[in-house]
């Protein structure tokens, strides 16, 4: 009789999974040109935005937009571009990007901030340069042509890049000799070095670094990256996995996307029966709900957000597994994971939601080793619990009974929790 009931209430069986990256991955292009020292050892690369395999900057592209895309696609995606991850990267920043402190989104030990030659030496730019220098960022003046207005910037700049073709090799060498004779501690980089003779002349004049076709043309690198929306989702999942959630940071992340903010407030207002007032802000939700409940609401909103282009049943499945693990967290085996139980269930389908391997995803989340093992291999008590839930989804009643025996659970108690989790997930879907 029990088996007939389960068969009638069995939930949706997921379809065959698509290939990884099919829906959420995009192709990005970046050109890199090496920067070398006097011994011709590569010290880093200048990164140049490209929108295709043609090795040229697209004429239609605004410089600020190009910088933003280069950063998002190569640094802020799910995993830094592996072809640039171990090198110091020289990145061009236009005036607006510097004023907005865009370089602060990147690790200071990995980049050199190039102040683009189109920048005007305004007070706003000077304040930005001062702050970046105080925060430990290396700064370079790109295609530098001296004018007194730039003099106050020089103490905060470590590298001065000079286009020896535009300035003229003799004039460039004379300028560098003069500055070094005055005691300048700046390092000078010769750009557009195209012959061995130019390299030797620039080196003897006092240039420290070199870049140009004589060493290497810019190399196009093509890779796949995850959409910015999914980057925000992973950042939020990382935050709610922490034992002590930084809700100030969570609020900032949620505020980056209007659709996500709306989903969160909709969840809070729809599902919180005991709140008599309408919740209109994240801070208000935190006050009324407390951290534990808000952790769950954020998880629900993010899962809904990233599953908008997926079958609704997949989102329903993520809710069902999350709620089942939450209900089972009261049992002895899982008390140590009570705070993360909901997330463990939800993360068991995260690979399907993001079209990315579970191995790659769990390494980016601050989870205990036994949780990672359960999600990757379905091993340990948590892995057995997830296996049990999956057997229920597939109407594998023999598997359900076997896993109940392994965990020491009463079959009827587990059945009730499974049905309750299924009912709860369906109710949530109806509410939203």
From Swiss-Prot:
SMART domains (UniProt xref): EAL (SM00052)
Q: SUPFAM superfamilies in the record, alphabetically?
A: EAL domain-like, HD-domain/PDEase-like
Q: What is its EC number?
A: 3.1.4.52
The annotated phenotype of a deletion mutant is: Deletion mutant exhibits decreased motility. Mutation causes a slight decrease in flaA expression but does not affect flagellar morphology. Mutant has enhanced biofilm formation and vps gene expression.
Cross-referenced Pfam families: EAL, HDOD
Q: Which reaction does it catalyse?
A: 3',3'-c-di-GMP + H2O = 5'-phosphoguanylyl(3'->5')guanosine + H(+)
Which GO molecular function terms does the record list? cyclic-guanylate-specific phosphodiesterase activity
- The UniProt record lists the EAL domain at 1-232
Q: What does the record give as the function of this protein?
A: Phosphodiesterase (PDE) that catalyzes the hydrolysis of cyclic diguanylate (c-di-GMP). Positively regulates motility and negatively regulates biofilm formation.
Know the name of this protein?
A: Cyclic di-GMP phosphodiesterase CdgJ
Q: Which organism is it from?
A: Vibrio cholerae serotype O1 (strain ATCC 39315 / El Tor Inaba N16961)
Classification from the root reads:
Bacteria, Pseudomonadati, Pseudomonadota, Gammaproteobacteria, Vibrionales
């Amino acid at each position: 009789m029990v088996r007939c009931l389960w068969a009638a209430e069995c939930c949706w069986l997921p379809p065959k999974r698509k290939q990884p990256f099919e829906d959420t991955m995009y192709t990005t292009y970046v050109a890199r040109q090496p920067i070398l020292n006097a011994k011709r050892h590569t010290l880093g690369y200048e990164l140049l935005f490209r929108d295709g395999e043609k090795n040229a900057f697209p004429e239609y592209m605004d410089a600020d937009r190009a910088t933003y895309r280069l950063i998002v696609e190569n640094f802020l995606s799910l995993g830094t571009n592996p072809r640039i991850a171990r090198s110091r990267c020289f990145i061009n920043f236009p005036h607006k990007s510097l004023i907005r402190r865009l370089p602060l989104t990147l690790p200071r030990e990995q980049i050199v901030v190039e102040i683009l030659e189109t920048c005007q030496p305004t007070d706003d730019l000077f304040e930005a340069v001062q702050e970046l220098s105080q925060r430990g960022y290396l700064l370079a003046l790109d295609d530098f042509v001296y004018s007194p207005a730039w003099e106050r910037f020089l103490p905060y700049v470590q590298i001065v890049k000079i286009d020896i073709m535009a300035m003229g090799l003799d004039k460039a060498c004379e300028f560098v000799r003069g500055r070094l004779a005055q005691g300048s501690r700046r390092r000078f980089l010769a750009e557009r070095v195209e012959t061995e003779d130019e390299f030797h002349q620039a080196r003897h004049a006092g240039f420290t670094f070199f870049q140009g076709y004589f060493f290497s043309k810019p190399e196009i690198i093509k890779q796949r990256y995850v959409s910015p929306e999914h980057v925000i989702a992973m950042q939020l999942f990382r935050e709610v996995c922490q034992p002590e959630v930084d809700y100030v940071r969570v609020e900032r992340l949620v505020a980056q996307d209007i659709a996500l903010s709306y989903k969160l407030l909709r969840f809070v207002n729809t599902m919180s029966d005991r709140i008599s007032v309408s919740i209109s802000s994240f801070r208000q939700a935190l006050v009324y709900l407390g951290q534990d409940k808000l952790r769950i609401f954020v998880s629900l909103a993010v899962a809904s957000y990233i599953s908008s282009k997926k079958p609704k049943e997949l989102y329903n499945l993520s809710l069902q597994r999350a709620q089942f693990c939450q209900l089972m967290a009261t049992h002895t085996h899982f008390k140590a994971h009570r705070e993360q139980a909901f997330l463990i269930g939800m993360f068991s389908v995260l690979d399907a939601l993001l079209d990315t391997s579970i191995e790659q995803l769990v390494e980016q989340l601050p989870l205990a080793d036994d949780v990672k093992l359960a999600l990757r291999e379905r091993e340990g008590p948590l892995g057995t619990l997830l296996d049990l839930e999956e057997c229920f989804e597939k109407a594998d009643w023999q598997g359900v009974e076997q896993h109940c025996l392994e965990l020491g659970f009463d079959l009827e108690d587990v059945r009730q929790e499974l049905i309750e989790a299924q009912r709860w997930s369906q109710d949530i879907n109806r509410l939203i």
